[in-house]
C-alpha cells in the first residue's frame, strides 16, 4: 500500500545575498545570473562559428569593387583606409566646435532668408476688413435721396467694391485705351489670390520656427562643449535646459 504524504506547503530555500562581512569580495552570483551569462556566452560562440564558416568558404580570388579603396597589412588584415595608420578619423574638440559653428551659421542664413520672405509677404497681405462704409449726411431728406453711384462717381457694378473701385472717368479712360471694363479682376479672384499669399506666408512662418528651434538646439550643443560647471534641469513638461555656475568676469 502506498504511503500517504500530506501535500503541504514546504519551505522555500532561496539563495541568499552576499554577507555584509564578505562584501569586499564583490557581488555573489546566483543561479539566474549564471544562466544569463552562459546564454550570452553561447550566443557569441554561435555567431563566431557562423563567421568562421563564412570566412572558410569565401573565395580568396573573388573580385569586389572595394579592393580599390582597401588593402591588407603584413598579417593579411584589412585596413579601412588607403593611408593606413597615417589617417586619424577622430576629430579634436576644436574641430568639432568649428563644424558645429559652420552648421549653425548655415541654419542662421536659411532662417534670415525665410524672415525676409515672411516680411515681404506680410506687407503684401492686406485682407479686406469686414466693417461697413458709413457715410454721414445733413438731413433725412438727403439720406432718402442718397445714391451710392452718384456719391462715388462710379457705376452700379463697381459700387460694392471697397477696393479697386474705379470711377467713371477711369473706366472711360480704360475704354478709350481699348480696354474692356470687364477685364478688371473680380473680387473673388482677388480674395483667392490673397488666400494663396496667406498660405505662402504661413509656410514661411512654419519653416522659420523650425529653423529657429534647430539653431537654438545647435547653439546649446556648442555651449555644452565649453568648459565650466553646469547643471541639467528638466521641467514638468519634459523640456531640458542647462544652468551654468555664475563666474566673475574680469
Swiss-Prot record:
GO terms for cellular component: nucleolus; nucleoplasm; small-subunit processome; sno(s)RNA-containing ribonucleoprotein complex. It is found in: Nucleus, Nucleolus. Residues 1-10 have a biased composition (Basic and acidic residues). Signal peptide: none annotated. Keywords: Nucleus, Ribonucleoprotein, Ribosome biogenesis, rRNA processing. InterPro entries: SSU_processome_Utp11. One of its GO terms (biological process) is endonucleolytic cleavage in 5'-ETS of tricistronic rRNA transcript (SSU-rRNA, 5.8S rRNA, LSU-rRNA). It comes from the Eukaryota. Belongs to the UTP11 family. Involved in nucleolar processing of pre-18S ribosomal RNA. This is U3 small nucleolar RNA-associated protein 11. It comes from Saccharomyces cerevisiae (strain ATCC 204508 / S288c) (Baker's yeast).
Amino acid at each position: 500500500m502506498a504511503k500517504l504524504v500530506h501535500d503541504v506547503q514546504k519551505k522555500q530555500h532561496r539563495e541568499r545575498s552576499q554577507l555584509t562581512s564578505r562584501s569586499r569580495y564583490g557581488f555573489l552570483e546566483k543561479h539566474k545570473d549564471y544562466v544569463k551569462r552562459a546564454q550570452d556566452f553561447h550566443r557569441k560562440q554561435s555567431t563566431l562559428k557562423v563567421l568562421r564558416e563564412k570566412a572558410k568558404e569565401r573565395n580568396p580570388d573573388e573580385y569586389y569593387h572595394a579592393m580599390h579603396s582597401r588593402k591588407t597589412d603584413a598579417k593579411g588584415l584589412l585596413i579601412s583606409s588607403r593611408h593606413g595608420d597615417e589617417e586619424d578619423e577622430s576629430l579634436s574638440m576644436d574641430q568639432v566646435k568649428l563644424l558645429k559653428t559652420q552648421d549653425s551659421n548655415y541654419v542662421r542664413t536659411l532662417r534670415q532668408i525665410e524672415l525676409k520672405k515672411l516680411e515681404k509677404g506680410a506687407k503684401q497681405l492686406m485682407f479686406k476688413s469686414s466693417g461697413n462704409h458709413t457715410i454721414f449726411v445733413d438731413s433725412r431728406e438727403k439720406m432718402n435721396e442718397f445714391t451710392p453711384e452718384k456719391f462715388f462717381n462710379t457705376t452700379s457694378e463697381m459700387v460694392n467694391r471697397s477696393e479697386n473701385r474705379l470711377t467713371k472717368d477711369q473706366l472711360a479712360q480704360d475704354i478709350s485705351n481699348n480696354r474692356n471694363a470687364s477685364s478688371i479682376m473680380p473680387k473673388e479672384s482677388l480674395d483667392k489670390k490673397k488666400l494663396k499669399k496667406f498660405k505662402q506666408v504661413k509656410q514661411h512662418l512654419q519653416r522659420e520656427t523650425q529653423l529657429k528651434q534647430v539653431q537654438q538646439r545647435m547653439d546649446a550643443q556648442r555651449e555644452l562643449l565649453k568648459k565650466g560647471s553646469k547643471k541639467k534641469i528638466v521641467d514638468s513638461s519634459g523640456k531640458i535646459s542647462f544652468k551654468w555656475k555664475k563666474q566673475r568676469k574680469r
